């Protein structure tokens, strides 16, 4: 992954940003597993914790091609899960710019996850698993990594309400993407 152009206007107004976003094609089984796991084991904990604290829980927005019936069935009236399915590049850019947190709850899969690099490029604060962070250098600079459902949920709840930390993570993504995924960074690797 190498980028030549970078975001010119990072939306750091987290007071106006809302929702949890997942992006991934559902022809790839790890993505379906991730959304099902998040929807069944993590998202209910987030809703419970936030409602208990008198907060309105965020919507969980799912974007990706080839949505299965099992994934589509997750969206029910008033449960906060929105299955958007396939969206255009423009719509996806808008979702990245307006969501508060990107979640990548992968439990299996191999290699660098394009969805993680894409979310970093788009300035999104990201919570993922160890699997989701595989192959990402200096992962601790831009990703929050949690593997257990309760820890993942608690991290979402804590980060979601911390606008300063959200802004800080978003700013770090832009430094990070230039350091690790720019043409200059690629040339540095080749020279080594």
What does each model-identified segment do?
Residues 1-77, 82-91, 97:
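Conserved catalytic-core segment of nucleotide-activated headgroup transferases in glycan assembly
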Residues 27-30, 111, 144, 178:
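Glycosyltransferase donor-binding loop in the core domain
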Residues 97-111, 124-125:
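Acidic donor-binding loop of glycosyltransferase active sites
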Residues 107-109, 125, 131-134, 150:
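Flexible glycine-rich beta->alpha loop in the catalytic core of nucleotide-sugar glycosyltransferases
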Residues 142-150, 158-163:
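Conserved acidic donor-binding segment of nucleotide-sugar-dependent glycosyltransferases
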Residues 164-191:
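A charged, aromatic-enriched C-terminal amphipathic alpha-helix characteristic of glycosyltransferases
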């Amino acid at each position: 992954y190498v980028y030549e152009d970078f975001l010119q206007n990072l939306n750091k107004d987290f007071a106006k940003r809302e929702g949890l976003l997942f992006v991934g094609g559902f022809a790839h089984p790890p993505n379906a597993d991730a959304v099902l796991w998040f929807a069944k084991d993590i998202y209910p904990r987030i809703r419970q914790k936030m409602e208990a604290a008198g907060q309105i829980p965020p919507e969980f927005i799912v974007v990706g091609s080839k949505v299965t019936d099992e994934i589509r069935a997750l969206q029910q009236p008033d449960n906060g899960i929105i299955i958007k399915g396939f969206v255009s590049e423009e719509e996806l850019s808008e979702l990245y710019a307006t969501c508060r947190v990107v979640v990548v709850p992968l439990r299996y899969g191999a290699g660098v996850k394009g969805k993680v690099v894409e979310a970093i490029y788009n300035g999104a604060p990201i919570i993922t698993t160890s699997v989701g962070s595989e192959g990402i250098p200096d992962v601790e600079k831009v990703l929050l990594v949690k593997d257990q459902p309760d820890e993942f949920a608690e991290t979402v709840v804590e980060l979601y309400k911390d606008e300063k930390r959200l802004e800080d993570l978003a700013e770090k993504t832009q430094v990070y993407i230039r350091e690790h995924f720019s043409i200059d960074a690629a040339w540095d690797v080749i020279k080594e």
